[in-house]
Design a protein with these regions (language model features):
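Alpha-helical multi-pass transmembrane bundles of energy-transducing inner-membrane proteins
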Residues: 23-25, 119, 123, 127-217, ...
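Alpha-helical transmembrane segments and their helix-start/interface "positive-inside/aromatic belt" motifs
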Residues: 25-37, 171-183, 386, 461-469
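Structural signature of hydrophobic alpha-helical transmembrane segments
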Residues: 1-9, 84-95, 138-150, 222-233, ...
Length: 510
């Protein structure tokens, strides 16, 4: 019964934030902070007391650490079916942690309609948790689409204009909504197609994940349905050429919106590939894998090159996310257990490091009232602590040994090399470009000639706690990743078996 509460807690907390605004602007902030702290606490309890050696695998009835199922719309085979395994647990822990940080980083930034802001923030996070737990495909789609509306309001009502003043927050919010809504509708068509094909074969109308895993699909039909899922996840990840909504959304979003977008919402797409696209359509995924990995490779370099050209610090970080998610895509489709686990570590590490960089850019904006790096420079001695901490996270983002980013990228490249050596070698050179745009960001913002001589306010206790906590977690993930690898091992083993057997069949057919 605890699984429904993981979803309900953010929704209830959001309503309480909205209702609590009549008693002052401070109460909604504390309610939101307690709500996300409770979610994180329950996640840690489940991690400490759960058996995460159970996970779905081909040829066996899916087994889960925790499962909850009740009938919802019986006539159409729709149920409220939730389940938890190692992968979904790690994603929920990331959601809880970044949820706490998104509340803290908006503590002073958001001054208008504070209750409604936190209602939207909590409902985004509730929808994300629903995505990570839902096994009924209709329920999964419901939560997938439900995240969009509160994120639209978050950007449209509390966002900023672009640094050059040409793009408004309404433009960015609308572009985000259209991209993700259109791709979601494509996935809905694919879900309905899968359900109908299974119904024609078995005579059973169901949206249940376990039943649809057994669906017998003609090769051409499987490929088309897989593409429907892939496009939806590729837009959210994002994969080039479906990425253009991301820089605008990040640049115009409030800091909390950027933290949730980069840290959590992008990970729902990678999770969707691992949970649904590969296991439901293994043969089509194996056939499509070279194309997917090539798209990942393009994303690594395209994101890096566009990051070079940015003057808005948040747009630079956004394009770096496109580059980092290219490594995740290669790891997912490589068919290697090592690379798959590396993709999970990279998802966690990128969530932490990107969230920290967006929090730091938000703190810069509060002091300078600009995100344009051409108007910065010479800040190293003008702001206490912030430049040095920014340098650490920039180094972590480029894969500094001893941080989780290094472990994730190393495992992806080592695991992929045995299967796709030419893609891996080219992707490795992308790390060089990653170091260049990270150092460009630091040089433009903190070094060079100072634009003014005034000393700016240093970081206060709240700001230091947020980023130092993320730094410690990144180092723990880099120095001792074994607990995270053990937690996700069973799930990734199952995904590897689905994809590996499909690769074997594809090779023998040729």
């Amino acid at each position: 019964m605890i699984l429904p509460w993981l979803i309900l807690i953010p929704f209830i907390g959001g309503l309480l934030c909205w209702l609590g605004e009549r008693f002052g602007a401070t109460l909604p902030r504390w309610i939101a902070l307690l709500t996300m702290s409770l979610l994180l606490g329950i996640g840690l309890y489940l991690w400490a007391n759960g058996d995460y050696t159970l996970a779905p695998a081909p040829g066996a009835e899916p087994a889960w650490a925790l499962e909850y199922k009740v009938q919802w719309i019986q006539r159409f085979g729709i149920s409220i079916h939730l389940a938890l395994d190692g992968l979904s647990l790690l994603m929920i822990l990331l959601t809880g942690l970044l949820g706490v940080l998104s509340v803290l980083c908006s503590w002073k930034e958001i001054q208008r309609h504070v209750g409604f802001f936190h209602l939207n923030l909590m409902w985004i996070l509730g929808g994300v948790v629903g995505v990570f737990l839902a096994l009924d495909l209709f329920l999964f789609f419901f939560f997938w689409e439900m995240m969009l509306v509160p994120m639209y309001f978050l950007i449209a009502l509390w966002g900023h204009s672009s640094a050059d003043g040409k793009k408004t927050r309404i433009y960015a919010a609308t572009k985000f909504f259209i991209f993700t809504q259109a791709s979601g509708l494509i996935m809905l068509v694919a879900i309905l197609g899968l359900v109908l094909v299974n119904y024609n074969t078995t005579g059973v109308l169901t949206f249940n994940y376990s039943d649809l895993l057994k669906a017998e699909l003609p090769a051409g039909v499987e490929y088309v349905l897989m593409l429907g899922f892939f496009i939806a996840f590729a837009v959210k990840l994002p994969v080039v050429p479906f990425h253009s909504w991301l820089p605008d959304a990040h640049a115009q979003a409030p800091t909390a919106g950027s933290v949730d977008l980069a840290g959590i919402l992008l990970k729902t797409a990678a999770y969707g590939l691992l949970r649904f696209a590969l296991p439901l359509f293994p043969n089509a995924s194996a056939e499509f894998a070279p194309i997917a990995m090539t798209l990942g490779l393009i994303g690594i370099f395209y994101g890096a090159f566009l990051a070079f050209a940015q003057t808005d610090i948040k747009r630079l970080i956004a394009f770096s996310s496109v580059s980092h998610m290219g490594f995740v895509l290669i790891g997912i489709y490589s068919g290697s257990q090592q690379a798959l686990q590396g993709a999970v570590i990279q998802m966690l590490a990128h969530g932490l490091s990107a969230a920290a960089l967006f929090i730091l850019s938000g703190q810069l904006y509060e002091r300078l009232h600009t995100r344009d790096m051409r108007q910065m420079g010479g800040l190293w001695h003008r702001i206490a602590y912030l430049p040095a901490i920014s340098l650490f996270f920039a180094a972590a983002s480029l894969g500094l040994p001893g941080t989780g980013n290094f472990v994730g990228e190393f495992l992806i490249l080592i695991g992929s090399f045995a299967h796709v050596p030419w893609i891996t070698v080219i992707a490795t050179t992308g790390l060089v470009f990653g170091s260049v745009y990270s150092l460009i960001m630091i040089h433009r913002a903190y070094f060079g000639p100072a634009k003014a001589d005034t000393v700016l306010a240093g970081m206060d206790g709240r700001e230091l706690i947020m980023v130092l906590g993320l730094a410690v977690l990144l180092i723990v993930l880099g120095v001792y990743p074994q607990p995270f690898l053990d937690t996700s091992a069973a799930t990734m083993s199952g995904v590897q078996q689905w994809l590996g057997s499909a690769f074997t069949q594809l090779a023998s057919a040729r």
